[in-house]
Amino acid sequence: MTNIRKTHPLIKIINHSFIDLPAPSNISAWWNFGSLLGICLIIQILTGLFLAMHYTSDTMTAFSSVTHICRDVNYGWLIRYMHANGASMFFICLFLHVGRGLYYGSYTYFETWNIGVILLFAVMATAFMGYVLPWGQMSFWGATVITNLLSAIPYIGTTLVEWIWGGFSVDKATLTRFFAFHFILPFIITALVMVHLLFLHETGSNNPSGLISNSDKIPFHPYYTIKDILGILLLILALMTLVLFSPDLLGDPDNYTPANPLNTPPHIKPEWYFLFAYAILRSIPNKLGGVLALVLSILILMLFPILHMSKQRSMMFRPLSQCMFWILVADLFTLTWIGGQPVEYPFIIIGQLASILYFTIIILILPAISLFENKLLKW
């Protein structure tokens, strides 16, 4: 009798994706983040579902419903903080996953890479709308500031903003629709993840050397399943340490004050994972220019396959490109720090220089260094 695992229409798909999948024998721990992102998504959907059972998306009761979850619901505090800090873990894994793709040249898989960038946008949109839901001061003002950026779009801007708000300011209609979108988007993300994997399995995984590994494959199970389980345990350990010891470490104290349209917080800033983009937005004095730079700071990832000038795929054997890559990482840390600082000297100029450096490295320096390395190797 043939194995049901290999014949059953549904189980067969799972088998080809997670069990009998031929995988390169040398993929490192940097390849763990795909599975970790899957676990993060599952954690977020499950905790979010239980939060939605007790949350009310009305301006009068939203804040107190979150308080009710934390105080009166069995383990409600745990679910709420797992969801809030789960988002932070999600973004840590996302940034490392994208960074791995950039370092090892995984972006040469066009479809997989582009769907990954779309996924990044979708996750950022979901996180932004989720941050609005507790209806604290930073929720309200964050929503006001970020949605207002759309008014920079010529001709249709103002109409578009009022259409998104459902009125003339961020109010009940805005909160209700943000809750609806925040609920549906993770399921759209799950569908996109499946397409992401579909395209990945068309080509097979990349590996640290960037060389074709068809002659040296091993089965995904048991080798990489056990490796993924180790990663998952470490992820859960990190998440639960954060949740149980310092759940508010990454949050903003202003969000423990109920939303008040008449009182603006002294420093409006998003969650830490948006600060690098926020710093780029603020570094341009022009509103439309800032919005364009903000969008391009993520959209530029789609240009990497076009800007790849090296004859080698990975940066593993390219020390000059490696050096530039780590300068780019340091620059992103600088932008993240600047995004959380007030708009005053010297932070303004540091932010502007870091923003210029970010785009210059990606568009000019990395391709130029790649061409230089080709010359050094007489290619």
From Swiss-Prot:
Cofactor note: Binds 2 heme b groups non-covalently.
Compartment(s): Mitochondrion inner membrane
Annotated positions binding a ubiquinone: H201
Binding site for heme b b562: H83, H182
Biological processes, Gene Ontology terms: mitochondrial electron transport, ubiquinol to cytochrome c
Residue positions binding heme b b566: H97, H196
Alphabetical list of InterPro entries matching this protein: Cyt_b/b6_C (IPR005798), Cyt_b/b6_C_sf (IPR036150), Cyt_b/b6_N (IPR005797), Cytb/b6-like_sf (IPR027387), Cytochrome_b (IPR030689), Cytochrome_b_C_euk/bac (IPR048260), Cytochrome_b_N_euk/bac (IPR048259), Di-haem_cyt_TM (IPR016174)
Main location: mitochondrion
Membrane topology: Multi-pass membrane protein
GO molecular function annotation: metal ion binding; ubiquinol-cytochrome-c reductase activity
Membrane spanning stretches: 33-53, 77-98, 113-133, 178-198, 226-246, 288-308, 320-340, 347-367
Cross-referenced SUPFAM superfamilies: a domain/subunit of cytochrome bc1 complex (Ubiquinol-cytochrome c reductase) (SSF81648), Transmembrane di-heme cytochromes (SSF81342)
Cofactor needs: heme b
A GO cellular-component term linked to this record: mitochondrial inner membrane
Keyword Cell cycle set for record: no
Record's keyword terms, sorted: Electron transport, Heme, Iron, Membrane, Metal-binding, Mitochondrion, Mitochondrion inner membrane, Respiratory chain, Transmembrane, Transmembrane helix, Transport, Ubiquinone
Gene3D superfamilies: Cytochrome Bc1 Complex, Chain C
Quaternary structure annotation from Swiss-Prot or TrEMBL: The cytochrome bc1 complex contains 11 subunits: 3 respiratory subunits (MT-CYB, CYC1 and UQCRFS1), 2 core proteins (UQCRC1 and UQCRC2) and 6 low-molecular weight proteins (UQCRH/QCR6, UQCRB/QCR7, UQCRQ/QCR8, UQCR10/QCR9, UQCR11/QCR10 and a cleavage product of UQCRFS1). This cytochrome bc1 complex then forms a dimer.
Known role: Component of the ubiquinol-cytochrome c reductase complex (complex III or cytochrome b-c1 complex) that is part of the mitochondrial respiratory chain. The b-c1 complex mediates electron transfer from ubiquinol to cytochrome c. Contributes to the generation of a proton gradient across the mitochondrial membrane that is then used for ATP synthesis.
Other facts noted in the record for this chain: Heme 1 (or BL or b562) is low-potential and absorbs at about 562 nm, and heme 2 (or BH or b566) is high-potential and absorbs at about 566 nm.
Family: Belongs to the cytochrome b family.
Name listed for the protein in its UniProt record: Cytochrome b
